[in-house]
């Protein structure tokens, strides 16, 4: 708000000083200043830019500068510019006016090589570029948002001369809003030497095994369909020895004239899209029908896929996709750069029944162990992704879901460094399958003072004490419930184990 008030204050002072009693004109300009000052902060700053076309002197006809007719084609414009620019380049031509002529050539080529600017010039003449050689940008006039609006006031005069004392309102408002005045200096940017067209990317879904996702894979052959240049016309879209002809609608001007409501209006020719030339149907290539490209459904490419891939990853193969869907005349190929799009390989990783990947570089494996191994400790065998088997020790008292790490056995990070392999223990508790197993579990519960465990066997009160009939009956009924019967070998082995266990506990060294 302070910014707007300052602008209005400065503008009002200048108006009062120079306008004097021309109160009517002063009011009109003041209202314009209020309107533009109110909208100026909302205008995107990027729209205020300095044009590449600069000429502080009188605006020169770009066609005359390049020695061309208005019907000149793009190739003729480019050829004429290169020829004259080489002749008058300041590094080659040491004549005093060579640099000025070189800049005139740049300005002319800047207009005629751009379809939009050329159309504006053909339609409006020098007025399309501010009348003084400065091309109108998005904000109009050399970086000032008020350039085009106040430019016409510079020529306002009365019987006693200009009531504004020669004030240029474009310069005034341009300075107030940080822009340069009309015709302000600035380095010219070099013109684009060619146009670029890039083909569409192609996405391929490729499945890989878990092992290949971890370690990568070489010489993978991918099949896909893509656009290629027509093999008959080499991408021109035309038969050999044929060329575009002048447009029958606009007669080579690229524009059409319409009269509406007494006003003459010009628009881009709908037949040639402003090019001024067109292809005759009989000149179209018989293979691609004038498109310049053809579909190749049997393309293949051999690639190496990197290690450490995960499901959903995309591998980009640059410059191997489709050719641009555009036909380019043979004489314009030097001014057009065509490049293929990319191939995007979307990875789908087959699930492995044993392994999974977490944290990008760690391979996880779940290992089931019985409760006895978890309690007493032991040794287990673990498979690896490579197909090998390794043996690791289980610590006594291992808990459910406890994880151990095996260093440098995970997903490769570099050629020498890998992540870890994580082994997670799953303790399996099985239901007793025989009377012997049940007796041992109950004995363990009794020894460990487990009051919560269900017990059907009651220990004797002393060695040699007879077991009452009721207990024996219950034991027999429990035994009959088990489908698996204890054979003599099992019972003998159990007897020996218990006997040896008692001897070890009591310290008896007898065999």
UniProtKB/Swiss-Prot annotation:
Listed under GO biological process in this entry are: 'de novo' protein folding; chaperone cofactor-dependent protein refolding; mitochondrial genome maintenance; protein quality control for misfolded or incompletely synthesized proteins; protein refolding; response to heat
Q: Where are the zinc fingers (CR-type)?
A: 217-297
Assigned keywords, A-Z: Chaperone, Metal-binding, Mitochondrion, Repeat, Stress response, Transit peptide, Zinc, Zinc-finger
Species of the source: Saccharomyces cerevisiae (strain ATCC 204508 / S288c)
| PROSITE patterns on file | DNAJ_1, DNAJ_2, ZF_CR
Q: Which GO terms describe its cellular component?
A: cytoplasm; mitochondrial matrix; mitochondrion
Misc remark: Present with 7570 molecules/cell in log phase SD medium.
Query: Where in or outside the cell is it found?
Result: Mitochondrion
Q: Name one Pfam family in it.
A: DnaJ
UniProt CXXCXGXG motif repeat ranges: 230-237, 247-254, 269-276, 285-292
Is Cytoplasm there in the keyword field? no
Q: Which residues form the J domain?
A: 59-127
Fetch the SMART domains from UniProt: DnaJ
Could you confirm whether the keyword Ion transport appears in this record? no
Any idea what job this protein has?
A: Plays a role in mitochondrial biogenesis and protein folding.
Q: Where is the transit peptide?
A: 1-55
**GO molecular function annotations of the record:** ATP binding; ATPase activator activity; heat shock protein binding; unfolded protein binding; zinc ion binding
The main location class comes to: mitochondrion
Protein name (Swiss-Prot/TrEMBL): DnaJ homolog 1, mitochondrial
């Amino acid at each position: 708000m302070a910014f707007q008030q300052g602008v209005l204050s400065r503008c009002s002072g200048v108006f009062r000083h120079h306008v004097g009693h021309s109160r009517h004109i002063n009011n009109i300009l003041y209202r314009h200043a209020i309107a533009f000052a109110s909208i100026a902060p909302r205008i995107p700053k990027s729209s205020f830019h300095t044009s590449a076309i600069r000429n502080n002197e009188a605006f020169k006809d770009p066609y005359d500068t390049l020695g061309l007719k208005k019907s000149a084609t793009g190739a003729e414009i480019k050829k004429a510019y290169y020829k004259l620019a080489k002749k008058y380049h300041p590094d080659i031509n040491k004549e005093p006016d060579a640099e000025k002529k070189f800049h005139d050539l740049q300005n002319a080529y800047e207009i005629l090589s751009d379809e939009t600017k050329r159309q504006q010039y053909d339609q409006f003449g020098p007025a399309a570029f501010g009348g003084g050689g400065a091309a109108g940008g998005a904000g109009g006039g050399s970086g000032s948002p008020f350039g085009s609006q106040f430019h016409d006031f510079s020529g306002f005069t009365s019987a006693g001369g200009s009531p504004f004392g020669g004030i240029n309102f474009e310069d005034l408002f341009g300075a107030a809003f940080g822009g340069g005045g009309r015709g302000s200096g600035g380095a010219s940017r070099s013109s684009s030497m060619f146009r670029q067209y890039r083909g569409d990317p192609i996405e391929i879904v490729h499945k890989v095994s878990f092992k290949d996702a971890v370690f990568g894979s070489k010489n993978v052959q991918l099949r896909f369909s893509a656009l290629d240049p027509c093999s008959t016309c080499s991408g021109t879209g035309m038969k050999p020895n044929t060329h575009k002809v002048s447009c029958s609608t606009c007669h080579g001007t690229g524009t059409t004239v319409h009269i509406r409501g007494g006003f003459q209006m010009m628009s881009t020719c709908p037949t040639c899209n402003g090019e001024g030339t067109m292809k005759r149907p009989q000149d179209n290539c018989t293979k691609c029908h004038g498109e310049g490209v053809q579909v190749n459904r049997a393309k293949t490419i051999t690639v190496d896929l990197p290690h450490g891939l995960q499901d959903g990853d995309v591998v980009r193969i640059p410059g191997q996709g489709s050719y641009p869907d555009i036909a380019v005349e043979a004489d314009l190929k030097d001014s057009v750069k065509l490049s293929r799009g990319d191939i995007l390989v979307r990875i789908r990783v087959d699930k492995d029944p044993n392994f999974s990947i977490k944290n990008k570089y760690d391979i996880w494996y779940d290992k089931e162990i019985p409760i006895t191994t978890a309690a007493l400790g032991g040794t287990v065998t673990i498979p690896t992704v490579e197909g090998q088997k390794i043996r690791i020790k289980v610590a006594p008292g291992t808990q459910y879901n406890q994880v151990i790490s095996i260093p440098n056995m995970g997903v490769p990070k570099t050629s020498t460094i890998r992540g870890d392999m994580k082994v997670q223990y799953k303790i399996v508790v099985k239901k007793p399958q025989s009377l012997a197993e049940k007796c041992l579990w109950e004995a363990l519960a009794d020894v460990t003072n487990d009051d919560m465990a269900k017990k059907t066997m009651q220990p004797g009160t002393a060695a040699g004490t007879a077991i009452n009939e009721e207990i024996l009956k219950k034991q027999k009924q429990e035994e009959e419930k088990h489908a698996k019967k204890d054979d003599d070998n099992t019972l003998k082995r159990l007897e020996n184990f218990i006997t040896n266990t008692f001897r070890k506990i009591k310290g008896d060294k007898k065999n």
